[in-house]
Amino acid sequence: MNIDLNADVGEGCASDSELLTLVSSANIACGFHAGDAQTMLTCVREALKNGVAFGAHPSFPDRDNFGRTAMVLPPETVYAQTLYQIGALGAIVQAQGGVMRHVKPHGMLYNQAAKDPHLAQAIAKAVHDYDPSLILVGLAGSELIRAGERHRLVTRQEVFADRGYQADGSLVPRMQPGALIHDEEQALAQTLDMVQAGRVKSVTGVWTTVTAQTVCIHGDGEYALAFARRLRAAFNARNIHVIA
């Protein structure tokens, strides 16, 4: 059994270099919520050095709140902003002789696109128009995955090790109780349930089915590196291969 393990990088965390030795995929911030040209270049070089697949991590234009502010923007604006961010990273990747593999929206752009078909359509169209060979990463079972499929993109359904789930398979909003899982044992058990059994227990106690093709671990967590190592060990013990 194979699973992709991904993390967001280029967001100002000192642990990026070490994290890139533990994951199989990296989502590189493109400047709208965090990062800049220099951090993008550094992350691309580190990913190439470690043989890690990497992609663009576009966001709403929201550096003040790390891309976590809800916004209502015309789909055409989201399309243009997504293209702009993918293109910025793409230029750096090309100059370094690499190949960008995927696009994964960030923060509130990701969460809103999971439920809003018009927003999801704008993102999927931008990815397709930039490079139809790119993989579109989105919340498992979401509108973003469906939009990617409509554009005949390869999609990757994502689950989260350290986030709480609602009964409909969506993530618990960050401002609500149960949004973040701080207990390492609980996060590990949830991840293994999603990967091996295709199910997740919601904060209300209801089990719901989920397709886990890639697991996100957040690199800005206090114990991110230790948890990443433990998760890798748990996968190895169960003959689950971490591969992009």
From Swiss-Prot:
The keyword ATP-binding applies. Keywords: ATP-binding, Hydrolase, Nucleotide-binding. GO terms for molecular function: 5-oxoprolinase (ATP-hydrolyzing) activity; ATP binding. SUPFAM superfamilies: Glycoside hydrolase/deacetylase (SSF88713). Pfam families: LamB_YcsF. Signal peptide: none annotated. It catalyses: 5-oxo-L-proline + ATP + 2 H2O = L-glutamate + ADP + phosphate + H(+). It is an enzyme of class 3 (hydrolase). CDD domains: LamB_YcsF_YbgL_like. One of its GO terms (biological process) is carbohydrate metabolic process. Its EC number is 3.5.2.9. NCBIfam families: PRK05406.1-1, PRK05406.1-3, PRK05406.1-4, PRK05406.1-5. Catalyzes the cleavage of 5-oxoproline to form L-glutamate coupled to the hydrolysis of ATP to ADP and inorganic phosphate. Belongs to the LamB/PxpA family. Forms a complex composed of PxpA, PxpB and PxpC. This is 5-oxoprolinase subunit A. It comes from Salmonella paratyphi C (strain RKS4594).
